[in-house]
Each structure stands twice: as C-alpha cells, then as structure tokens.
Amino acid sequence: MYYLRRIAFFVPLMLLISFMAFSLVRLAPGGPFDKERKPASPEVERALLAKYHLDEPVWKQYLRYLGGLVQGDFGPSLKYRNHSVTDIIAQGLPVSLSLGGMAFLFALGIGIPLGFITAVNKGNFGDYAGSFLALLVICIPALVIGPILIMFFAIKLHWFPVALWGSPWHAVLPTLTLGLYFSGRIARLMREGMMTTLHSEFITTARAKGLSETAVLFKHAFRLAVLPVVSYSGPLLADLLTGSFVVENIFQIPGIGVFMVNSSLNRDYTMVVGLVLLYAVLLLVLNLAVDFAYSLLDRRVRYE
C-alpha cells in the first residue's frame, strides 16, 4: 500500500511541478527569439509567437501543453526548431545516463571501501590519510577538477582524449571529474555509519560469542553501516545527473546537460520545462527505489 500511495502521489506532484516550471520560466526577462542571428522584424516576431502559440494567455498555453503531455509530446524546441523536445531527450538522455551511471559506480567503488578502511583504522594513519583525501575531493569542485585532469592526463601525458564522447577512453576523465566529489561524500557517510554500528550492542554480543573480527565486520557491521549510503543513493543519482551539466559543458559531451544550459540561456521554454519534468520523474523514481532497497537491507523497516 505504501508504494501504491507513493505512485498515486506522483500525478498531482508532477502537475504542480509542471505548472511552477511553466510559469517561472516565463517570468525570466527576455524571450525565445531575442537572440536570433539576425534581429527579427516585428512582423516576423509576431508570426513566430503565433506559430508557437506564445501570443495566447499563459493559462491557455499551459492547458495546451498539458494536452500534449498526455499524448507523450513535450512540444517543439524553440531554439532547435528542426527537432522536438522528445527527440532531443531521446538523443541526449542515454549519454547523460551513461555518464551518471559510471560516475555513480566509481563513487561507490571508491567511497565505500575508503570509508570502511578509515572507520576500522580509527586513530591510525589510514584513518587520517583517508579522511584527508575524502575532504580534499569534496572541497574541489568539478569546474576545477575537470580542467586539471585535462591539462595533466590529456594535454601533457596524452593518455586520454581531451573532449567529446565516442569511445570508452572518452568517458574516463568526465567520470573522474563527476565522481570524485561524490566518492568523498560517500566515504564520510560510510565512515560515520561504520563507527556508529561498531559501537552497537549487537556487535559487542557478536564478539562475545567468539566470532572472528572479519565475520563481525563484514557479516554483521557492514550491512547496517551501508544504510546511510543507500539512503543517499537517490539524491546522489539526481545530483550526478544535474552535476553533469557542468561536466558535459567542460568536455563537450552531447548529453542533455548541454541542451539544458543552452535552452535556459536562450529562453527555450518547452525544452526547459520538459527537462525539469524529466529530472523530477527520475528523482521520484530513484527515491522510491531507494526506499525499497532500504527495506530489503534493514528488516526492521516496514513501510505501510
């Protein structure tokens, strides 16, 4: 029942998000035809407004937009006029999902072991070194890490391509740029979860029963210590997708982040609203999946 209620709640929530995005994007100064290569005459501008129904009242435009959404149509792009929003999403979303997925796996693969090691070696060199490394990557934004990686690994050493997206080698530097920050966040969450779990009574009981330290750490402590990371996974995936805006622009990757930035700057109303709705759906679905995974890992949790 809990999951059915969550799914049923999606519809009114998406209506609210669509209305807010549709209204707010039109409050921004400027219009979708202000940055034409050649300044449009008043007659041409009026014709363009009429063609895309932008001369109608906002409430009427919104109802027309909802009618298209019901049919799976996000409308035409006002900047990329030979393409619809649906076409552009179909083109860019797989690229952004691939980049975000690889960065997610990288962040988990680095952050969880690093947090585990620092917690188990609390007060030792491993703890201090790992904690410093996690804090360091958190403090350096992708806008700084990206150019550094390009200059060192691409321009100086020629190990990886500078930009674009076409082979596995093209994905290495963008994945590192996007995933390093989140690996530090996960490491800190894992360390805190592990330290809290190691002080629990059931861990003391397990040790008193004569279980080996390896069994205590991996069979009993790890399963509960990783729960904060699981809870963070939903927002993490959403952050990776939105954080890819910067990375995609640095490395000129043809994902939806590039389209989102360009559409926002050019007041491409339909594109902006369509991408906002897309990210909202992804966030809602990911949070629901995280709740389900959390209940599987911790049997004490029951959603009703």
Regions found by a protein language model. Give the residues of each.
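Hydrophobic alpha-helical transmembrane segments of membrane transport/permease proteins
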Residues: 13-64, 79, 154-173
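Transmembrane helix irregularities
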Residues: 28, 137-140, 241
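Cytoplasmic-entry segments and transmembrane alpha-helices of multi-pass inner-membrane transporters
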Residues: 1-9, 113-149, 250
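An internal, D/E-rich "acidic patch" concept
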Residues: 55-112
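Alpha-helical transmembrane segments of integral membrane proteins
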Residues: 1, 89, 93-126, 165-304
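Membrane-interfacial helix-loop-helix junctions in multi-pass membrane proteins
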Residues: 50-58, 75-82, 186, 262-270
